Amino acid sequence: MTTQVPPSSLLPLSPEQLARLQAAVGEFSPTQMAWLSGYFWGMVNQQPGAVVAPAVAAPAAVTITLISASQTGNARRLAEQLRDDLVAAKLNVNLVNAGDYKFKQIAQERLLVIVASTQGEGEPAEEAVALYKFLFSKKAPKLPETAFAVLGLGDTSYEHFCQAGKDFDNKLAELGAQRLLERVDADVEYQESAQQWRQQIVAALQARVPAQSAAAVAVTPSGAVDEITSSPYSKAAPLTAQLSVQQKVTGRNSEKDVRHIEIDLGDSGLRYQPGDALGIWFDNDPALVEELLALLWLKGDEQVSIDGQNISLSQALRSHLELTQNTTLIVDKYAALSRDEKLIALLADKSALQHYAKNTPIVDMVRQAPSDLNADQLVALLRPLTPRLYSIASSQAETENEVHVTVGVVRYDIDGRPRTGGASGYLADRLEVDGDIRIFIEHNDNFRLPANPETPVIMIGPGTGIAPFRAFMQQREADGATGKNWLLFGNPHFTEDFLYQVEWQRYVKDGLLTRIDLAWSRDQADKIYVQDKLREQGAELWNWIQQGAHIYVCGDANRMAKDVEQVLLDVVALHGAMDAEQADEYLSELRLARRYQRDVY
């Protein structure tokens, strides 16, 4: 059958429109033509009041869950940057702090991205412990419908580099989830590798998920990630403040050198909360710089490039490069450069290599294995200088425009030569009162006083771990908090090492500090530590927990914090009539409720 085209005079189309229509419809099948006729009829009849068949709903947009598992803020900042990248790519993203993530919903996740830091001996960040324990428990579900990616942040100066990221990555795969990308393990100088990873993960997610219109993109950050106090000052742009007080607070016969530091914030407007940390930038000891230059037969006036700028080698070593922390990677590189037989042999023994890197400063490694590096080789060998973080020991409710920290000065000898910690030596020996110091606040929403001032508080902090609890008590006093307060503190000797003794005695006298238990490890034949005191008071501890107490632990992550946690588990099991698995779950529930918080390092 031949279709006759009506005379052009009878058509509502111009000859040009008719030609375009005929060219277009030539590509359609009869079925498509029939559908188009109905489509055009619907367009003509879609007038106000007309009944139109409802459009088929578009499939719900897939949401990418982005978990930040941060210890010192780096993972959080990277997660926020990735969130912004995904939003710019018109992808739906839910950014959540690991401590606020409802991990029992993980089986419903389709696209999961984790940015995870590592602390201590390969442990996850404090805010990620509950999620970590759940994934490694019998309750963890299979995840065959989940695709994931992990970025690990760590420090090669530690033996278990990026272990938390590795554990998350391996466990998710073991549970049946599919990798979007291979895991990336980033060192202290993580910016370049993290930037590449961000670009790769955005591309991988774009390939999985169709982009949404700008109006449709959902950004649902949750938890503490986006509640950080805003400030013009940061790690990259620190405040230049002034040192106002530097005072030794241990006795002259003490084995420890602990300094109380007060810094004047002036009218900077810098704000912090009890539980936050102070980041301090420092310069290396000029004497250490000269010693290293002399060992390598370098003058120090050689020009080197640091962050795209040419400066003298001496300036680079003093203000830009890490000299007081050695790593296995540096030992490995230096062994190749120096061709030293002892160092090369050391590389074959992982345990011995770790021990050597931990206990041998860079300058002493160079002394023991002489070499003739040039300036560029030396710069390439070393890592960028990084600031040190100290738990803040004051509340602005009392100190206003000041911030206080408690610093344990690192001092030791290598082959009869005195060595000092980078930042602690700078604060104790080289920075003068009224001198300039570059600082920033590292906010820590995972170490906060309870919102209810009537809630009891248990504070466990031996040594310099007492610092944040000084801030806590200043805040509780200023708030007129009526909740009970219990401090457990320990150090070697009562007469030499009772940090802030007068202040604690006043709090006891005034009734603000309900009870205090002290452990002096060297004042008797048998060593006594805070964990021993805690175990002795197990029944009382359980009573406080039953009354809703919040438990805080600050200090050494490798020994003290682990021992304290074991005591807590034992006390819960004994007095709560639970088995080990139930006690562990109970402690995890306390963590999720923010009733068990740790600031350990």
Curated annotation (Swiss-Prot):
* Leading EC class: oxidoreductase
Instruction: Identify the residues that bind FMN.
Output: 70-75, 117-120, 153-162
List positions binding NADP(+): S521, R522, K527, I528, Y529, V530, Q531, D563
Q: In which pathway does it act?
A: Sulfur metabolism; hydrogen sulfide biosynthesis; hydrogen sulfide from sulfite (NADPH route): step 1/1
Q: Its Enzyme Commission number?
A: 1.8.1.2
What is the source species? Yersinia enterocolitica serotype O:8 / biotype 1B (strain NCTC 13174 / 8081)
FAD-binding FR-type domain residues? 236-450
Keyword list (alphabetical) reads:
Amino-acid biosynthesis, Cysteine biosynthesis, Electron transport, FAD, Flavoprotein, FMN, NADP, Oxidoreductase, Transport
**Where in the chain are disulfide-linked cysteines found?**
none
- Detail which positions bind FAD: 324, 358, 388-391, 406-408, 412, 421-424, 601
- Cofactor dependency: FAD; FMN
Catalytic function, reaction form:
hydrogen sulfide + 3 NADP(+) + 3 H2O = sulfite + 3 NADPH + 4 H(+)
* The keyword Aminoacyl-tRNA synthetase is annotated on this UniProt entry: no
Which protein family is named in the record?
A: Belongs to the NADPH-dependent sulphite reductase flavoprotein subunit CysJ family.
Q: Where is the signal peptide?
A: none
Q: Which InterPro entries match?
A: CysJ, CysJ-like_FAD-binding, CysJ_Proteobact, FAD-bd_FR_type, Flavdoxin-like, Flavodoxin/NO_synth, Flavoprot_Pyr_Nucl_cyt_Rdtase, Flavoprotein-like_sf
A GO biological process held by the record? cysteine biosynthetic process
Q: What does this protein do?
A: Component of the sulfite reductase complex that catalyzes the 6-electron reduction of sulfite to sulfide. This is one of several activities required for the biosynthesis of L-cysteine from sulfate. The flavoprotein component catalyzes the electron flow from NADPH -> FAD -> FMN to the hemoprotein component.
Subunit structure and binding partners: Alpha(8)-beta(8). The alpha component is a flavoprotein, the beta component is a hemoprotein.
Record's cofactor remark: Binds 1 FAD per subunit.
Q: What is this protein called?
A: Sulfite reductase [NADPH] flavoprotein alpha-component
Any Pfam family hit: Flavodoxin_1
Cellular component per GO, a single term: cytosol
Flavodoxin-like domain: which residues?
64-202
What start-end ranges are recorded for coiled-coil regions in this protein?
none
Superkingdom as given in the UniProt entry: Bacteria
An example of a GO molecular function for this protein is:
FMN binding
